[in-house]
């Protein structure tokens, strides 16, 4: 095999590795965007008229993000997580993509999740007990 053929095969191999790496990074970024920065597995989805609050759990920690149903300009959004016996941890402001993530250590305690986009909201009651 000539040196030209070897160079072509090396170039092809490098291109395949680069493409595979790019796909892996894209998939990771997509998963990160879907979770809004929360670690763990999704355990609840709390839909409401103008958005959805996603709840994740891992190793005793509970995390939540609120995402609007439709993209658009910045608007008032919030997400709140309260472990039973503690004060709620809240992220409230004007965002265009999501509110949160908000993470609390719940251990084996129940949590109360709230989310809002504009005037519409959701409140879970005590869950994950």
Language model feature labels by segment:
Residues 32-129:
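Post-signal peptide N-terminal regions of Sec-secreted extracellular proteins
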Residues 1-33:
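Secretory targeting and sorting signals
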């Amino acid at each position: 095999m000539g040196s030209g053929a070897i160079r072509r095969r090396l170039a092809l191999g490098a291109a395949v590795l680069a493409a595979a790496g790019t796909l892996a990074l894209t998939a990771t970024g997509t998963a990160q965007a879907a979770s809004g920065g929360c670690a763990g597995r999704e355990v609840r989805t709390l839909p409401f008229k103008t958005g959805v609050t996603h709840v994740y759990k891992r190793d005793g920690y509970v995390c939540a993000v609120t995402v609007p149903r439709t993209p658009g300009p910045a608007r008032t959004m919030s997400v709140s997580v309260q472990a039973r016996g503690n004060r709620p941890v809240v992220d409230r402001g004007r965002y265009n993509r999501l509110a949160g993530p908000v993470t609390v250590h719940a251990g084996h305690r129940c949590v109360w999740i709230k989310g809002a986009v504009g005037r519409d909201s959701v409140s879970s009651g005590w869950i994950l007990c």
